[in-house]
């Protein structure tokens, strides 16, 4: 997962500080997610999925399709 969040960030040409500011955290704290030093909390996973317009399953490596899921019709 840490490689996916790094690759997504780099694809946008963003630095760690920019993503950390979006997440309202320090660059050092965010860096630990990308290196795998710290686990990524669910709340941060949700925020990253929203930021990168992808699914949590993609971030977790459960699918190779980066497209977000379609909402289930009610």
Where are these regions (language model features)?
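DNA major-groove recognition helix of helix-turn-helix/homeodomain DNA-binding modules
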Residues: 24, 43-58
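Short, charged recognition helix plus adjacent turn
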Residues: 11, 32, 60-74
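Short alpha-helical DNA-recognition segment
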Residues: 13-32
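Alpha-helical residues within the helix-turn-helix
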Residues: 10, 21, 50
């Amino acid at each position: 997962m840490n490689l996916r969040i790094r690759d997504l960030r780099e694809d946008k040409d963003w630095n760690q500080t920019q993503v950390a500011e979006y997440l309202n955290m320090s660059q050092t704290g965010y860096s630990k997610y990308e290196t795998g030093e710290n686990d990524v909390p669910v709340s941060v996973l949700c925020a990253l999925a929203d930021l990168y317009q992808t699914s949590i399953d993609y971030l977790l490596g459960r699918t190779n399709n980066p497209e977000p899921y379609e909402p289930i019709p009610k």
